[in-house]
Amino acid sequence: LSVKIMKKKTKRNRERSHIPFRLNFLFFIVFALFAALIIQLGRLQVLNGASYQAMVNSTDKKIVTGNVPRGMVLDAKGRVLVGNSAKSAITYTKNMNVLADKMYAEANQLTKYLTIDKLDTLTERDQIDYYLSNPKNLKKWNARLPKSKKVAADGSKIPDKTVYQSTIDLVEKSFTGLSDKQKQAAAIFKIMSGAYQLSTVYIKNDNVTDKEIAEISEHLTSLPGINVGTDWERSYPNGDSMRSIIGHVSTEEQGLPEDGINSLLAQGYSRNDRVGTSYLEKQYESILHGSKSQTQVEVGNNNQILSSKVLFKGQKGSNLNLTIDQAYQTKVEAALKKIYAKAVAAGATTYSDGAYAVAMNPKTGAILAMAGEQNDRTTKQASDDALGVINRTFVMGSAVKGATVMGGMMDGVISPSNNTLPDTPIYLPSTPVKKSVYPVGTFGSLSAQSALEVSSNIYMMQLALREGKAEYIPNKKINISPDIFTKMRGYFNQFGLGQKTGIDLPGEAKGIEGPTLTDAGLPAVGSALDLSYGNYDAYTLIQLAQYISTIANGGNRMKPYLVDSIQQTGTDGNLGKLESKTSPTVLNTINAPKSYFNVVKEGMYNVVNGTNAWGTAHTLKDIKPTFGAKTGTAQSFAREDPNDSTSKQVETVTSSLVGFAPYNDPQVAIAIVFPNLTSDEGHYNTLLAREMITDYYKLNNISK
C-alpha cells in the first residue's frame, strides 16, 4: 500500500514540475514579442521617425492654369473691329477629390443667393444626377435594385459605375422632374461636377446682379471654391460689319470643337476653353489665344489646398491688324446691298444665289474689301456672306478672257504684232452654232485687243482650236489634241484660275473642273471651246481677283492676305510692340514678256474707254483716273426648287466683272459676280464697279 502511495506522489510531483516550465516558456514568448515590439517602435521612432513624419506632413505641388482675354482685331487704320468686354462672374474652383454630396449641398446653398438664367441645356439625365447626389436618395434607390444588378452570377461585385447606371435606369421609369428651385441647383451642380480638379469654371457669367455679388461675397467662407471674379466676351464696337470674315469664338459650354479637340488638347488647352471656331478667329487661334496664367498650388495629404503662388500672371492674346480699311469695307458693303436691292426690285433675282465683291492691292495681295450677300430663295431674305468670296464657285463667263488671250500668246498661236483672227462662227455636228453675243457677220476679223473690247467668244474659240492643233471644217467632226484641257487649264492656273489662292482663311475652295472626255472617251471638243470663253469651269471670286491682279502688276501671282501685322498687347492693355508684319508673297511669275501683258491691258482699257458700239463697259469711261476692266456673262442654270435637287433646271445668267485702277499705276483690283440672274439688263456688275472704284479714289485722295 505504501509503495502505491509513494508512486502516486511521485507521479503527481512529476506532473507539477511541467506546469512552471510551460508558464515560464509562455512568459518568455510574451517577453520576446514585447521586446520585438519595443525594438520595432524604437526603430520607427529613432531611425525612421523623421521620414514618417514627413509623409504625414507631405504636400503635393500642382500647376493650375487660367484663361486670359483674347487679342483684338483692328482695321488698317487702327479701328477696333473686335475687342473684349469685361463682366462680373461667379466662379468655382474645384478642390481635390470633392464628393458629389458636398457639391450637392453647396449647389443648394448657392440657389439662395443667385439665379441661373439658362436652364434649357439641363437634360433629364442632369436632373437625375443631381437628385442621386443626395445620399438619402441614392441609398433609397440602391436598395430597390435587385441583387442581380449589384452582384454578378459568379458572386463578384459589379463595378460601381455599372451599378450607378442601373440605378439611373430605375429612377428614369418613374422620374417626374424637379421643382424650379431644384432645377436651379441642378444647373449649378452640373457645372461643378463637370469641372476638373483645381480648375476654375464659371457658375454664372451673364447678367450677374450687384445683389448677387453682395450676397455671395458675404457667404464666401461657407462656400468652398466659390469666388467673385470677372469674365470677358467678344465685343464689336463698329457693329456686325465683317463678322463673317472675322469668325466666331466658342462659349465655355461649347468648349473645344470636336473636329480639332485632340490637337488642341495636345497643345495644352482644356476641354471647356473658348477657341476660334471659324475664319480669322480660327486661322489665328494660336496668336489671339494668348498665354494662360500659371499658379502653383500646394495640396496637403488631406487633399486640401494649403497655399498658392502665382508663377505667371498670363499674357493677353496678341492683336491682328488687318489690311482692310473699315471705311472702304463699309462703302463696298453698302453699294453691294443697294445694287442687289435694285436687282430684286427688277425681278432679276428669282433664282439668284446673291452677290459678291472683293478688292485687292494688285502689287501686294493685301485684301482691301470683301463683301457678300447670300440670298435665301426660300425665305427671300439676304444675309451677310463675305466668305462666299473664297468658298463659293461660279462659272464666270467672259471675265476670264484675258487669261485665254495670254495663253494664246504664251502658246505661240498669236503674238503682240500678229493677232488678228477671223470672227466666223463655229459649227459642230448636232450642236447649236457657237458664236458671240452680237449678230453673226458683225465683224469679219478682230485683233486680240478688239476681241476683248467686244467680248468675242469666237476669237477665244479660235485660240483654243489653234492650241489644240485642230483642223476645223464646218459641220464636221473636229479632231483636237487630247491635252487641250491640260494646256488651257495650265495657262489659267498660272494666273490663279482653278487654283487655291493661299489666302489666310480656312475653307477656301479650289474651283470645279468640268469633264474632259465624251461618253465615247474622246476629247470633248465643244466643252474645250466653252472653256476658252469662260463658260465651263467654275472659279471662286478670290481667284478672279488674283487673276486680274496678275494682269495688272505684269505677271506676279500674289498671295492674298487679310492680316497685315501682329502686335503684342502692352502691360497697360493697349497695343504693344510689333511682333511680325506680313511680307507680300509671289506664288509664281508668268514667264512672258511685257508686250504680252500690254496687249491684254490695252484690250481691257478699250472695254471701258473704246469707241466700238459693242463695247461692254463704256458707261464707266467718265471715271477719272481711268481704269481697265473685263465684263463677263455666263450661261448658267439653277434648280426651280432650291430644296429639290431633282427639280427642273432653269436657264439663268451670271454677270461678272474684273478690273484694275488707276490704269497707269494700278493700286486696286476688283472682282464682282452676280450669279444666276434671270436677266443682266440692269448691268449690275458695272454699277457696282463704278461705286467700288470711285469710293476707293475718294477715300485715298486719288484724282485725275
Regions found by a protein language model. Give the residues of each.
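Short N-terminal helix-loop-first-beta-strand/juxtamembrane motif that initiates sensory/input modules
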Residues: R70-L74, L223-N227, A345-M360
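Membrane-proximal periplasmic segments of bacterial cell-envelope enzymes
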Residues: S2-S286, K292, V297-I305, F312, ...
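Beta-lactam-recognizing serine transpeptidase/beta-lactamase-like catalytic domain environment
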Residues: V82-G83, S88, E298-K313, I324, ...
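Short, gly/Ser/Thr-rich active-site loops of penicillin-recognizing serine hydrolases
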Residues: L578-E579, T585, L687-K704
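Solvent-exposed, polar/charged alpha-helical surfaces in well-ordered, non-transmembrane soluble domains
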Residues: D101-N108, K112, A214, E218, ...
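Short, basic/aromatic recognition patches
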Residues: Q53-T65, Y328-T350
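Active-site His/Glu-centered metal-binding helix of metallohydrolases
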Residues: G42, A399, A403
